[in-house]
Amino acid sequence: MPRRRRIEPRKILPDPKFGSELLAKFINVLMVDGKKSIAESIVYNALETLAQRTGKDALESFEIALENVRPTVEVKSRRVGGSTYQVPVEVRPTRRNALGMRWIVEAARKRGDKSMALRLANELSDAVDNKGAAVKKREDVHRMAEANKAFAHFRW
């Protein structure tokens, strides 16, 4: 943590095809070993498949899927008097996006389809319909926060 001034977050360049910063960030989350062109082709193929399946705009469908996966509350461990409590806290908007993207990518990697583009397309399609592993992860996090609502006064 800086002592003097707040550090400005780095500006991310929008992706070349759709011109979306959110999609560029998602491509970066999916990227492995710095192979961005491969990550881009996977994402664009997945979005193309998703657009054909839903009949809607690919970017719009992606944003709906991400919206359905984003968590609003999460739990953080807080140690008070020798015991650890899971304290529910609201998630900051940047972290909300980051978690949603990470969960979609993790869920897609765990699927058993042929190619990563197909796995990602299926996971995004499920997320648009409010089902799938990524949405389940969000529900679990929300349930955990709801169960620990009694400890909300330990917030810092």
Swiss-Prot record:
InterPro entries: Ribosomal_uS7, Ribosomal_uS7_bac/org-type, Ribosomal_uS7_CS, Ribosomal_uS7_dom, Ribosomal_uS7_dom_sf. It holds the Pfam family Ribosomal_S7. It comes from the Bacteria. Keywords: Ribonucleoprotein, Ribosomal protein, RNA-binding, rRNA-binding, tRNA-binding. Gene3D superfamilies: Ribosomal protein S7 domain (1.10.455.10). GO terms for molecular function: rRNA binding; structural constituent of ribosome; tRNA binding. One of the primary rRNA binding proteins, it binds directly to 16S rRNA where it nucleates assembly of the head domain of the 30S subunit. Is located at the subunit interface close to the decoding center, probably blocks exit of the E-site tRNA. NCBIfam families: rpsG_bact. Part of the 30S ribosomal subunit. Contacts proteins S9 and S11. Belongs to the universal ribosomal protein uS7 family. This is Small ribosomal subunit protein uS7. The lineage of its organism: Bacteria, Pseudomonadati, Pseudomonadota, Gammaproteobacteria, Pasteurellales.
